[in-house]
């Protein structure tokens, strides 16, 4: 995980160009109008944090003295959960329910609880384990699959994401998903669920936006900075999210800032004074047809103020929500840190399909062999292997073995492995040197005539086709064809039946050509990078059955998988993500390099085949990379495939 803590003001200015490039707030005369008046004074409401309930006049308050309070529109108490609480966030849980998250001051534990807003009954609280740092703030996030997460913001840059619920319910126990490196002066956070975006303040520096999804990268982008590098006069404080925009407090200057999202940046709309408030610390908003309703807490007086802002952010176009398929098993994490696991290949045991194997490359170690339960069975430390492919029935001396071939970046060669057809044991079977300077991808082609060919590609776009031979007992390769693409390729897969080769050009798309050695290497576009397929184009796999054949592509740029017909005109059948399997404790898959798929009946949940994908970001818990095993039946059901 990479995190840059920007401390150099000149670097901030160079990075953002905010002072010169960001549109300045509207003039005060043209700014949206806001008038605040005290709220809850007659009921003597004192709260450290407050939230409005969408579609209702009721409010939820967190109080150090009185606990969690459900209040009516005038501040009168409707329900109470005793205790001492600070910091608050909530999400709906059905038409008459909500889930609240707050910090229990007595135990310094984040606490979640459901509330029926009709009967005013509290559910059983769920508490996170006590942390080894002081928790300053928290916020909830519900993803596209309706998994509920809690973010913790702590002192000295500590941050965490926890899985706490599914659908409308809290889980029986919270599960740690990942750690986050946050600014050391962070205290507040908010999440835009629809955009999967986490906002965090850095008091004396500015406001930051991070991807909220647990499978996303941890890169951050600025929303605004403290002067002279941005529009915040003195400080960055609490925030509130509206569709397409953000509201943020500058407590030291007693001002409210409005932002409109524009692409991947935020434009400052207005900076409004908050007269009568000395230190506005908390803010809660609810968007309505008439504008934006606000609640603001003044820390200096302890009073709460309400008002309506005659401004609404313009909703922005969001990426389409892709369906999610859960992995049923996952491999043991690889034995090397960083970008290590890369490409899987499925070997089908001809005698006992349930005893099939998943071979996986570790590009910092060698070849790994797993059972269908994900347990590591063999390690072959033969060098930095990148891609791997498998074909049955290779003649090696007097034996007939199944053959795995991997691209070896240490030697720029093809590493060959014999697979015992009875036991599944994998053994090195030789090397075939190539003239490639930086070998990357590899795939095999086995036409009906029985020969075995290997396609190897390099970073410079070259493809070399070798005819493999093992009759002498030692594997060898003869170069029979060469062609190239204009930029870096990697993934490839051959359709043995139709003698067609699919190749991926990472920043461009997928091509098809004749796989036969004697044929001209004429490239035909299958799919270009665009709205559905996002660079980098990585792993390619073929699902072949009696009903229909499909090409599966790793769309690394948006952590998804694209499915096409494997025959012209290569019709798009859909795209999906490999998501969280909370019940099994398996995280989703992201930043996938290689994949493989088979239609073979491997028994049990794999009776329609299996998809294996490399997971570039292992979460829940955070560990080294691994491979996720997905039942093809679930992919077919999700996309409506034959």
Identify the function of each model-found stretch:
Residues 17-20:
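C-terminal motif of bacterial Sec signal peptides marking the signal peptidase cleavage site
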Residues 13:
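…; additionally, a secondary subgroup of soluble metalloenzymes is captured
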Residues 22-642:
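Sequence/structural signature of beta-propeller domains
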Residues 2-10:
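Bacterial N-terminal signal peptides that target proteins for export
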